[in-house]
Amino acid sequence: MMNNRNNNKDKNPVKRFNKISIGLASPESILKESRGEVLKPETINYRTHKPERDGLFCERIFGPVKDFECACGKYKRIRYKGIICDRCGVEVTEKKVRRDRVGHINLVVPIAHIWYFRSLPNKIGYILGLPSKKLDMIIYYERYVVIQAGIAKNADGESLQRLDFLTEEEYLNILDTLPQENQYLDDLDPNKFVAKMGAECIMDLLARIDLDALSYELRHSANNETSKQRKTEALKRLQVVESFRESNENRENRPEWMIMKVVPVIPPELRPLVPLDGGRFATSDLNDLYRRVIIRNNRLKRLMEIKAPEVILRNEKRMLQESVDSLFDNTRKASAVKTESNRPLKSLSDSLKGKQGRFRQNLLGKRVDYSARSVIVVGPELKLYECGLPKDMASELYKPFVIRKLIERGIVKTVKSAKKIIDKKEPVVWDILENVIKGHPVLLNRAPTLHRLGIQAFQPKLIEGKAIQLHPLVCTAFNADFDGDQMAVHLPLGPEAILEAQLLMLASHNILNPANGAPITVPSQDMVLGLYYMTKERISTEDHIILGQDLTFYSAEEVNIALNEGRLELNARVKIRAKDFNDAGELVYKIIQTTAGRVLFNEVVPEAAGYINDVLTKKNLRDIIGHILSVTDVPTTAAFLDNMKDMGYKFAFRGGLSFSLGDIRIPEQKTKLIADAREQVEGISTNYNMGLITNNERYNQVIDVWTSANAQLTELAMKNIREDQQGFNSVYMMLDSGARGSKEQIRQLTGMRGLMAKPKKSTAGGGEIIENPILSNFKEGLSILEYFISTHGARKGLADTALKTADAGYLTRRLHDVSQDVIVNIEDCGTLRGVEVAALKKNEEIVESLGERILGRVALQDVINPLTNEVMVQSGQQITEAIVKTIEASPIEKVEVRSPLTCEALKGICAKCYGRNLATGKMTQRGEAVGVIAAQSIGEPGTQLTLRTFHVGGVAGGISEESSIVTRFAGRLEIEDLKTVKGEDSEGNAVDIVVSRSTELKLVDEGTGIVLNTHNIPYGSSIFVKDGETVGKGTVICKWDPYNGVIVSEFTGKIAYEDLEQGQSFMVEIDEQTGFQEKVISEARNKKLIPTLLVYGKEGELIRSYNLPVGAHLMVENGEKIKAGKVLVKIPRRSSKAGDITGGLPRITELLEARNPSNPAVVSEIDGVVSFGKIKRGNREIVIESKFGEIKKYLVKLSSQILVQENDFVRAGVPLSDGAITPDDILRIQGPAAVQQYLVNEIQEVYRLQGVKINDKHFEVVIRQMMRKVKVEDPGDTLFLEDQLIHTKDFILQNDKLYGMKVVEDAGDSSVLKPGQIISPRELRDENSLLKRTDKNLVVARDVITATATPVLQGITRASLQTKSFISAASFQETTKVLNEAAVAGKVDDLEGLKENVIVGHRIPAGTGMREYDNTIVGSKDDYNEMMANKEEYIY
C-alpha cells in the first residue's frame, strides 16, 4: 500500500506531498482502508442488473451506482448528500466514489503472498533460511514443520530441531508419544511441542524471528565463513534481513505481513462489468479471480464449522492458497487459471506490467484533449514560424475561446447558442477566430517524436482545404516528407503554456540541432539544387558563348537590370563593387570577382556575414547558416532562411534541371580496367596452382584486386561526369550539391555494381564476400545471374529496416530511462578533476580536430601557449570559437576540460562541467534536462545505423589491405625499441627485418620538435630507414605481408621440431588443385603436446624456441639450416569477412550494456616480462613477471592466437591474445577514466562510420550514469555488506559520517557502552574520565575502519533498474520484482527524477518546473524596494 507523507487536511490531500513511501500492508491497515467485507461471490442480479448486496459490486460497500441515489430509491437528489439510507445502508453520494472505495475479504486461514515466495530472490525463504522447494511443501500443505520442539522426540529418540520437516504419519506418531497435557500448554511455553503446516505455520515462524539477532548472526558467519558458497548464501540472506531492518526506521514493516489474513478488493470501477446486447456481460478477469477466492473461502468456512476431516480441510486450504496466488500473480504459477478459450486470466500484477500496464499505459502515456491531426502538405510561402491550419480544424480547436468572445460581444447569450453559430460557420465566427489566433501558437508534432525537435510551436494561418501546411525548412527536424505523412496539432491553453511555446518552442528559435550544435533548418533537395545552380560559374567556350562574361558592375541593382534585359547570364563570371571584410576584419567596399547568381544570393545575406563567394552546396549552406546565426541574431537568421528558401525554389524552377540516360556517362576505359583485373586474378590463380600461396591468401588477394579495380573505375566515372559540360551535367549537379544521390549510387549507375556478400544462412556460416563481382552497372543492365545475386542484398535491406526500427526504439527507451534524472542543478560543483582531450586520429588521419572536441567546454586549468607563454584561456572559462582558433594555431595537442564524467554534483550535474548548451550556443542554464537531451541525441540517429555490417544494398565495402607505412610529412625519425635482423625479402634483396613487437616510430618536425605523427611498426616487416634519419614526404618506411602474420628467426642456426607429430599436432594438408603439401598446426588431441620450433646454434646449444599457434603454416623442415631473418611460420590473417566487425546498432548496444565481447582478449594486468607455462585443459599458460617480482598467470585458449613471444616486455592493459578487450578489464587495470574514454570513442566510431555527428557530451552524460555505483570490497565498520552495490554518493556520505569516530573493543566497567558500538572521541573521553574517577576499568576503543569499494560499470538496463527511485525503476522493466523489493525494504521515493514526477502527476523538476521557483514571488522593482524598506523598519 502506498503511504503519503505529510497529509494536509485540505480538500485533496494527495496534491501536497514530496515523497512517497512503500511498504508491506498490515492486516489492520487493510481493514482501516476498507469500506466493508465482501461476503458473497455474486456480482449483479441478472434480471434487475442491480448489484447484489454483500457481493463484489455491492453498493453498500463501494457506493451508489447512480449519482446521489441510494439502492432502494428512498433518497434521491443532491440535497440528501452524505445521508446513509436506513433501508439499504447505501450512502447517498456521487457515483465516482466507486473508483476509490476498497473492500476486503477476511480469509479463514492466513495465505502467503505469492510475490514473496515465488519471485527471486525468495524473500520468505531467505529470512527463514529455507530453500524454495521446501517452502512450497509447507505452503501447499504437504509437510508439517516444527516451530517449537518442546519435549518431543522423533522415532529414533532424538530431540527434534526447529524447522524439522515431518510427514503426517511422523507428526501423528510424535503426538501419540507426548503426554496428553502437553496439548493444553500455552504456545509460548518452551516445553510445548508446536508443529504446523501451511501459511499459518510460516506466519508463526516469521513472527518469532528477531531480526536484529539474525542480522548479527549472519554478519558473523559472512565474515568468518570459509566456504565460498555458504558465504554468498549468508550475504544474500543478510541483504533481505537488512532491508527489513532499514525499512523499520521509517515505518513499521514486519516480516509476518508477507502472509495475508485479509485480502483487499479493489474498487469495482477498476474491474468493470459491462452489459453487452443479448443479455451477456463483458467483465474484467479480476472479477473471476475474486469470485474463486470468495467461493473457496466460504466453502472452507462452512467445512470448518461442520468440523470436516483434516484431509478435506487441508485440500480446501491448499485450493484457497492457489486461488489467492492466481489473483495476485497468475503468470508466475505453473498452472495458471485459464478462460474457456485457453487464455490465462489477467491478474493484479499483470495490470501493472508491460506496455499495456498501469505504469506505461496510463501514468506515463496520458491522452490529451484539444488536439487534431491531418495530412501535411508543403507551404512554401509561409514564414519560418508559421504553419497553415485548416479553417474547420481551427474553429474546433479554438472553440472555447471563440465562444467566450461571442458572449463578450453580446452576439449570443448562452454557450449552447454560441456552439450553434460556430457549427453553422457564420461569417462573424471567422472574424473572431482571426482575432483569437493572434499570439496564440499551436504545437505541431509528428510521430515518432525521436528528439525534442519533433514537437515545435508555430503561429497558425487560417487556410482553406483540409490539410495542414508545413514550412519546408522544418521538415528535417520532424523527419517529415509530403508523401502522405500526418501530423498532430495541440493547443497550449494557459497563459504560461502559451508563453513557453512562444519563447522556447517556436520553430524560428530551434535552428540548431541539440545533438551537435549544427544548424538543422538547412535547405534540402530542390532548394539546394536551385542555390547550387545559381551560384555555379560557367566560362564561355567556342560552341557555348556566355553572355556578359567578365563585365564589371557598380552594384547589385545593375546586375539585376542586366539579367532582366537578357544581356547577362546567371552563371557568367563578373566583377562587382560590394562590401566584404578586409584583413583587419572591417567591412569595406571591394571589387570582387564573382558570378551573377552569387550577386543575387548576397542580396539576401545579412551584411554582418560579409560577401559569400562560394558555390552553395548543402554542406556550405549549413556552415553559412551557423555563421550567420553566430554573428547576428535569431530573427535576422530566420528572415535570411526564408529569403534563401524562396530563392532556392525560384532558381530550381528557372533552371529546369532534369536528367536523361545520356547524362549517365560510362567511362570508355571500363573494358580495359576489367580485362586488367581479370588478368591479375588469372595470375593469382596461377600462383595458387603452383603452390606459392594458400587458398586463403588467394581469396583475399582476389577480393583486393576487384576492390581496387572498382575504386579506380569509380574515380574515372566521377571524373568523366565532373568534366562533362563544365560540371553542368544534371546528375553531377544533384550529387555535388548534396541534393540527392551519393557517390555509391553514381558508381552503381556508371561503373560496376561490384562485390556482393553471400546470404547469411545460420549464425555460423555465410556472410563472406562472393569473389566474382557484378561487372555490369544499372545503365547497361544486369544479367540474370547478376540480378539474382543483387536481389538478396535488396531484400535483406528491406527486412533489416523493419527490424531495425524496433531495436532503435528500444535502445532509445533504455537510454531515456538511465539518464532521465540528470538535470543541471547547480552552477559549479567546484571539482578539480577533468578529462584530457586531444585530437582523435585514426591511422594518423585526424578524424576530429582538437578544436571541434573542446568547443563550448569549460577549461579546467589555464591553457598557456608554449611559444609565447600567454594565457589563452583561464580556468573556468568557456572555450569559444575565437579561443579555439588561437589554440589550433598554437602547438598545443591536449587540453584539460571539465566534463560530465568528472562532475561532483551530488544531484544531477553542474553547468560548468556540462558547458555550452548546443541548441542555443550559450552556457547551459540551471534546470536544463540534459539527460533527456543526451538520450534523444543518441537514440534519434539509431534508426540510421545499420543493423549489422556496412553494406550499400548488399555491396561489400572493405578497403584494400594496407601493407606499408609511408610518411605524410617531411621530418626526422625517432624509433624506439627497435630490434632488427638482416634477411632477404621475397625478391631476394637484402633487407632489415623487424623482430621487436613494440617498436614505435615518431616523425618529428625538425624546426619545432613537435611530434607530427606516430606509427607502430609491425613485427616481421622489412624496414628501410634508420633512427635519427631525416626523410622527405612520401618515403616508404616499411613493408609487410598484409595477408599473413609471420614468425621470423632472430638467429642463424639449425631447426629442430619439438612435439611436432604428424596427425597429432600438425596435419599435412594437400591442396586439391595444386597437389602441394603444407604442414598446418592443428589442435592436438593429446593436450600435453606443445608444438614448438627450436633453433640450435653452431655448438648445438639451444638459442631460441618458438611456440606455434593453431593454424600456423610451417615454412621450414626439421633439421634445415637457416639464416637470421628467415620466415619460419606463416599465420594466415583471418580473411576479411564482411561480417567480421559487429557494426551499427548491435555494437552500440554491446557497449552501452557493458557486455563482454564473445571472444575477449586476455589482458596483462602488470608491466613485466613474458614467459610460457604449461598447457592446462586446452589452455596455454602465460606467466608475466614484473621488475618487483610480482607474478601473474593467465590462461589463453589454444585456438586463439597469442600476440606475445617469450621474453617480450609488456605493459599493463596490453592484450596477450587476439580478440576485443572487455570494458571490465580496462576499468580494472587502467581505471575509470580510461574506460570512460574508451566507451565514448568506441561508440563515436560506430556513429562516425555512418556519418552521424553527435557531441561527446551526450555520451559522457550516459556513461556517467553507468558508473554511479561502487562495489563494496571491505565494509569495515559501516553497515554495508561485502559485494553490495551502492550509489557513490551514499558511499562517500557514509564514510564521511564515520570518519574520526571510535569503535568500542572492550567496554570495561562502563554501563553505557557495549562492545562494537560506534562513538565519537568526545564521548569516549567523557566516559573514560568518569570511570577513571571511580577507579573502574577503562573503555578500550580503536579507530573506525571505513569501507573500501571499487567502481563498477553497469549496463544501461541494470543501471536504470537500480536507480534510487523505485517508481522510475518499476515503470521501466520487471515491475513486480522492483515493487516487491521496494516494499520489503520500505523504500522512500524522493521524487527527484523526471519520470517519477510524471507518474505521480507533478510538474517535472526541470526547466520552469524547478522546485525553487514554486516559492518565488514575481513582482515589480518598486514593490521589492518597498518591501525591503518595511522589513528594515520592522527590524529597528
UniProtKB/Swiss-Prot annotation:
Stored HAMAP family: RNApol_bact_RpoC
Cofactor note: Binds 1 Mg(2+) ion per subunit. Binds 2 Zn(2+) ions per subunit.
Catalytic activity: RNA(n) + a ribonucleoside 5'-triphosphate = RNA(n+1) + diphosphate
Gene3D superfamilies linked to this entry: 1.10.132.30, 1.10.150.390, 1.10.1790.20, 1.10.40.90, 2.40.40.20, 2.40.50.100, RNA polymerase II, clamp domain, RNA polymerase Rpb1, domain 3
Alphabetical keyword list: DNA-directed RNA polymerase, Magnesium, Metal-binding, Nucleotidyltransferase, Transcription, Transferase, Zinc
UniProt keyword Cell inner membrane, yes or no: no
CDD domains linked: RNAP_beta'_C, RNAP_beta'_N
GO cellular component annotations of the record: DNA-directed RNA polymerase complex
Residue numbers binding Mg(2+): D481, D483, D485
One GO biological process term: DNA-templated transcription
Protein family per UniProt: Belongs to the RNA polymerase beta' chain family.
EC number: 2.7.7.6
Subunit structure and binding partners: The RNAP catalytic core consists of 2 alpha, 1 beta, 1 beta' and 1 omega subunit. When a sigma factor is associated with the core the holoenzyme is formed, which can initiate transcription.
Protein name listed in UniProt: DNA-directed RNA polymerase subunit beta'
